[in-house]
A protein has these predicted regions:
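Conserved active-site helix of classical SDR/Rossmann-fold NAD(P)-dependent CH-OH oxidoreductases
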Residues: 22-29, 64, 92-93, 118
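Short beta-loop-alpha junction of Rossmann-like oxidoreductase domains
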Residues: 50-51
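A glycine/serine/threonine-rich, flexible loop-to-helix segment
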Residues: 54-62
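C-terminal substrate-binding subdomain of Rossmann-fold SDR/epimerase-dehydratase oxidoreductases
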Residues: 1, 46, 67-196
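Short secondary-structure boundary/capping segments
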Residues: 7-8, 64-65, 99
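Catalytic helix-loop patch of NAD(P)-dependent Rossmann-fold dehydrogenases
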Residues: 1-41, 55-56
Length: 196
């Protein structure tokens, strides 16, 4: 929930990422309180869709890139860690509704449909119609075991919840990547950075 303030290792390898998000929420609320500036805080969870950056180390472009190049898909750990993927159109609608509201506390905007990274890689293999295997590599330190938003406030305050199914969103995203010139496929990451 939005009331959860985190349980992170501030000196771990992903500490800067986690702490930077918490700092931005703190500074945003400080401006809101002390300067009377209207602010909104949206907590965005894993987002995907056409035109996402090809080489930012996220799971989906890495998996699709590996599949398009005929490579095995890389999963860190045993693949049991979970993520929740929100299609970009749904995210934009959620952000817009928050901006148009008068609510100034944090709101989670993401898709609560949770999937393991192993299952997600299997979905990509099935979607692409390829015969790749999944290759497992050691899990990085402090990699989140679960990432699933509670969107109760988004539903109650904004009347928002995601509409695009993961299957539909994956198909749209895959078609976008597949139709890029083949030289662009080389820009897709060789594997994802597990900490994102």
């Amino acid at each position: 929930t939005e009331e959860y303030w985190g349980n992170v290792n501030p000196v771990g390898p992903r500490g800067v990422y986690d702490e930077a998000k918490r700092f931005m929420e703190s500074i945003t609320m400080a401006y809101n309180r002390f300067h009377g500036v209207q602010t909104r805080i949206v907590r965005i969870f894993n987002t995907y869709g056409p035109r996402m950056r090809l080489n930012d180390g996220r799971a989906l472009p890495a998996f699709i890139g590996q599949a398009l190049r005929g490579e095995d898909l890389t999963v860190f750990g045993d693949g049991s860690q979970t993520r929740s993927f929100c299609f970009v159109d749904d995210l934009v609608e959620g952000i817009y509704r928050l901006l148009m509201s008068d609510y100034d506390m944090p709101v989670n905007v993401g898709n609560p449909s949770e999937i393991t990274l192993k299952e997600f890689a299997e979905e990509v293999i099935k979607l692409t119609g390829t015969a790749q295997k999944i290759v497992y590599k050691p899990l990085p330190v402090d990699d989140p075991k679960q990432r699933q938003p509670d969107i109760t406030k988004a539903k109650q305050i904004l009347g928002w919840e995601p509409k695009v199914s993961r299957a539909e969103g994956l198909k749209i995203t895959y078609d976008y990547f597949k139709n890029l010139p083949k030289e662009e496929w080389s820009k897709l990451p060789k594997e994802f950075v597990s900490m994102k």
